Swiss-Prot record:
Record keywords, A-Z: ATP-binding, Kinase, Lipid A biosynthesis, Lipid biosynthesis, Lipid metabolism, Nucleotide-binding, Transferase
Annotated coiled-coil segments of the chain: none
GO BP annotation list: lipid A biosynthetic process; lipopolysaccharide core region biosynthetic process
Gene transcribed to yield this protein: lpxK
The protein, known as: Tetraacyldisaccharide 4'-kinase
Class in the EC hierarchy, top level: transferase
GO CC, any one term: plasma membrane
Length: 315
């Protein structure tokens, strides 16, 4: 079902969307009136989330923020729920050597690229508490968790897909909305991942190089220009990645997998011998069985100096 259009199925599911909306409003109100207790912490918490389902590019922003504050001398940690991982009980401290099937792809990717402590727990508030106690951090960034109201936060950052925006503007399951669009009025910052809108900060994803998953060898962006390649993506919005490869002049054979999909070696065996291109998020799940034909596209997030000035002022 397409969550960006208003088809028959979308309308048929509207009664369920109404129930979802009322339940989410009630739940938030119960936290606001202290019927449910909010867990407070010894150090600031920055939440990077969204109000829709589907990929909006939160993780590159989390990595960028973590690296920035590390350079400022902060002891930074990151918490996540660990979607796609097999760890379901209590907290898991993720390092560069953690099994990706245990942690999930995003926690391991952050641990590898940002080189800092990462804690996974379905209960984000508990993840924050455990990270403070075990790793002596003084700033925590939550990858997602905008709707996890049990976790107190100092800064809220909402990330929006600049192309799809809010889809058909229906609530789940008829549409992509987790919360009302008005929720954006209460967050501290709105980041747009495509295009410019008043009141929103624009993030640029800078394409760097292709990196061989097995050897670490790097090749320039035009290396596969004019070649036939397989494009593999198990992310929230794979078409964005495929469009990027096509703009690089690649004759693409796309293969879409579910978000957080756990790859098996057999998934990436094709009859031809064309190169296989993937995202960094896909890469961490393929390292154990990688071959010389597997490459990932290295990207780097960039936000304006003005954004960081305003962020530090609020923090």
């Amino acid at each position: 079902m397409d969550l960006n259009t208003r088809g028959i199925i979308n309308y048929l599911l509207l009664p369920i969307s109404g129930i979802f909306y009322l339940a989410s409003v009630l739940r938030k109100w119960l936290y606001q009136v202290n019927f449910f207790k909010v867990k407070k912490f010894k150090c600031p918490v920055i939440v990077v989330g969204n109000i829709t389902v589907g990929g909006t590019g939160k993780t590159p922003i989390v990595i960028l923020l973590a690296q920035y504050f590390k350079q400022q001398g902060k002891q930074v940690g990151v918490v996540l729920r660990g979607y796609g991982g097999m760890h379901h009980k209590g907290s898991l401290l993720v390092s560069k050597n953690t099994n990706v099937y245990l942690s999930g792809d995003e926690p391991l990717l952050i641990a590898l690229q940002a080189d800092l402590p990462v804690m996974v727990n379905r209960n984000r508030a508990q993840a924050v508490e455990d990270l403070i106690n075990q790793c002596q951090v003084n700033l925590i960034i939550s990858d997602d968790g905008l709707q996890h109201y049990r976790m107190d936060r100092n800064i809220e950052i909402a990330v929006i897909d600049g192309t799809r925006r809010f889809g058909n503007e229906f609530f789940l399951p008829s549409g992509p909305l987790r919360e009302s669009i008005d929720r954006l009025k209460s967050v501290d910052f709105v980041i747009n991942n495509a295009g410019f809108r008043a009141g929103e900060f624009n993030i640029k994803l800078i394409l760097k190089v292709f990196v061989n998953v097995k050897t670490g060898e790097e090749k320039p962006l035009d290396y596969f220009n004019g070649e036939y390649c397989h494009g593999v993506a198990g992310i929230g919005y794979p078409q964005r990645f495929f469009d990027t490869l096509i703009r690089l002049g690649i004759n693409l054979k796309p293969h879409i997998f579910a978000d957080h999909y756990v790859y098996q070696q057999s998934d990436l065996v094709f009859e031809d011998n064309y190169p296989i291109l993937m995202t960094a998020k896909d890469c961490v799940k393929c390292i154990q069985f990688a071959n010389n034909q597997m490459w990932y596209l290295q990207v780097e997030a960039n936000l304006s100096d003005n954004f960081f000035k305003e962020l530090e002022a609020k923090l």
